[in-house]
């Protein structure tokens, strides 16, 4: 996660974006201009790659990409009506608003990279190889801990001269070692 992005950086980005890209709907441009004109709203705006898990989001598209032109959602309610979105943004200016922008070369844009944040609600997706490595590490750690615990119990059995416990624990240790192989 990067350091906090300033209000001025976000406003500069919105102005750059609107000058560089033609929105699919003029209302999308109006909403972005409205946001950029109000520092108290910009403070709560976060530009993200996806809106997964966000409580309140706005998805806007420029010409040249295959995405819905305008989507606004809050909780389980989704709308393509810019007036409803504008009304909610205006009235609930102090609520976090996550904005997803779709435009050509978005992922290679240095201007967008400057203001883009990680979505704190998105599920972390691990590759299968990473999952296998994590599982192996967990298994190895648990096995090592269990083995050390049994060795400690063997030492205690020797200290107390408990031959039955000693033989039982040695068998457990041998079984653990053969299972690991």
Swiss-Prot record:
Alphabetical list of Gene3D superfamilies matching this protein: Uncharacterised family UPF0302, N-terminal domain, Virus Scaffolding Protein, Chain A
InterPro entries in the cross-refs: IDEAL_dom, UPF0302, UPF0302_N, UPF0302_N_sf, Virus_scaffolding_prot_C
Pfam families linked: IDEAL, UPF0302
Similarity annotation: Belongs to the UPF0302 family.
Designated name of the protein: UPF0302 protein lmo1921
Source organism of the structure: Listeria monocytogenes serovar 1/2a (strain ATCC BAA-679 / EGD-e)
């Amino acid at each position: 996660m990067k350091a906090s992005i300033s209000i001025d950086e976000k406003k500069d980005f919105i102005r750059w974006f609107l000058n560089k890209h033609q929105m699919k709907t003029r209302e999308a441009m109006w909403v972005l201009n409205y946001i950029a004109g109000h520092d108290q709203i910009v403070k709560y705006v976060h530009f993200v790659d996806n809106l997964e898990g966000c409580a309140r989001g706005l998805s806007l598209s420029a010409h040249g990409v295959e995405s819905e032109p305008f989507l606004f959602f809050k909780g389980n309610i989704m709308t393509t009506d810019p007036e409803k979105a504008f009304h909610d943004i205006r009235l609930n200016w102090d609520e976090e608003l996550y904005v997803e922008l779709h435009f050509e070369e978005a992922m290679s844009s240095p201007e967008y990279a400057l203001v883009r944040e990680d979505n704190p609600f998105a599920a972390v997706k691990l590759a299968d190889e990473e999952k296998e490595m994590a599982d192996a590490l967990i298994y190895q750690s648990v096995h090592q801990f269990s083995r050390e615990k049994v060795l400690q119990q063997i030492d205690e059995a020797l200290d107390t001269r408990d031959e039955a416990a000693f033989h039982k624990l040695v068998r457990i240790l041998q079984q653990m070692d053969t299972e690991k192989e």
